[in-house]
């Protein structure tokens, strides 16, 4: 199992230092997200000073950028990292695409993302092999690529494309044509086994691929410490985050996979602005299903037991204050996960 560092929202120029620290702790990969900053600029800083790490976006929002724009950014990062870049894409939701990015939302995110990836790969094929650019789909059309705008071939042209999603359609799309899939941190083993993996495997089989062709990646809610008191403190922060996700109708299917019926109550509380009361509505047993609860000395094995071969890469959505302040213990946990 590989272990990845997720760069928190911060200025791109600080990513180099963060990457060096991540490498020193033994992390395998360095992932960025599109939140308060562009997801690509931190990687340009980090890749220069941490040549032993893999890099990826988790995720970059696809639809506000054209496939050709995204293709060029990924191509340049694949060149800079010498093939150690993984392009992670997400669809976001209508409100963000339309109101935050002022872009069009066609209402068919999975079919649109399929075309988006096909169009990007057509651009890369044109640059690498000289294939005339000709892509025609329902949402995207590309037919112009002159030598002046062609960056030319690179050593590692097969840029891995990962997508993120919650529901069955994007899980299936990953199985059909992607190199990897970012499992949303708000998940349970039941949801992986009943929704994500079956849909992914079915689509992979229909496309003459296998589940092994899709690397599954996720971040984990970690609730840990050296004592019961420290673990309970760690739970409190996770409980608040879980209450937020559970209140969002988009994630309701995760609750349904475990027969949990308290999602609508949280939604109603959020609409009333009762944010400070929502965490108390999350039952204790739910925390152990959406995250990992274990003392530090057995944390790595507990994560391995939870995921088995369900995922191949993990990161830490939360660590708890005890582990965050103990680099030696964190380094050991990372090493144990990798062994």
Residue ranges and their predicted role:
Residues 1-339:
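Active-site-adjacent structural elements that line small-molecule/cofactor binding pockets in enzymes
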């Amino acid at each position: 199992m590989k272990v990845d560092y997720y760069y928190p929202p911060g200025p791109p120029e600080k990513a180099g230092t963060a990457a060096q620290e991540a490498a020193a702790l033994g992390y395998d990969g360095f992932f960025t997200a599109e939140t308060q900053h562009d997801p690509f600029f931190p990687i340009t800083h980090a890749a220069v000073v941490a040549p032993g790490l893999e890099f990826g976006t988790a995720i970059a929002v696809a639809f506000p950028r054209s496939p050709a724009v995204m293709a060029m950014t990924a191509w340049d990062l694949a060149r800079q990292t010498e093939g150690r870049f993984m392009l992670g894409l997400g669809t976001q939701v209508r409100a963000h695409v339309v109101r935050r990015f002022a872009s069009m939302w066609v209402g068919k995110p999975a079919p649109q993302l399929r075309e988006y990836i096909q169009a990007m790969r057509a651009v890369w094929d044109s640059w690498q092999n000289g294939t005339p650019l000709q892509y025609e789909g329902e949402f995207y059309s590309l037919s112009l690529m002159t030598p002046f705008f062609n960056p030319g071939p690179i050593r590692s042209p097969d840029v891995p494309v990962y997508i993120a999603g919650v529901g069955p359609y994007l899980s299936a799309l990953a199985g059909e044509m992607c190199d990897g899939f970012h499992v949303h941190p708000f998940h349970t083993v039941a949801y992986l086994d009943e929704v994500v993996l079956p849909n992914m495997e079915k689509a992979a089989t229909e496309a003459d691929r296998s589940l092994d062709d899709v690397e599954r990646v996720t971040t984990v809610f970690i609730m840990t410490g050296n004592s019961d008191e420290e673990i309970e403190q760690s739970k409190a922060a996770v409980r608040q985050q879980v209450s937020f996700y559970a209140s969002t109708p988009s994630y309701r299917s995760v609750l349904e996979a475990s027969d949990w019926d308290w999602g609508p109550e949280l939604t109603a509380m959020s609409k009333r602005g009762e944010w400070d009361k929502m965490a108390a509505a999350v039952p204790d047993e739910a925390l152990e299903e959406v995250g990992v609860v274990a003392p530090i000395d057995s944390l790595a094995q507990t994560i391995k037991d939870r995921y088995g071969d369900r995922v191949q890469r993990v990161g830490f959505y939360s660590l708890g204050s005890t582990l965050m302040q103990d680099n030696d213990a964190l380094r050991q946990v990372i090493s144990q996960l990798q062994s």
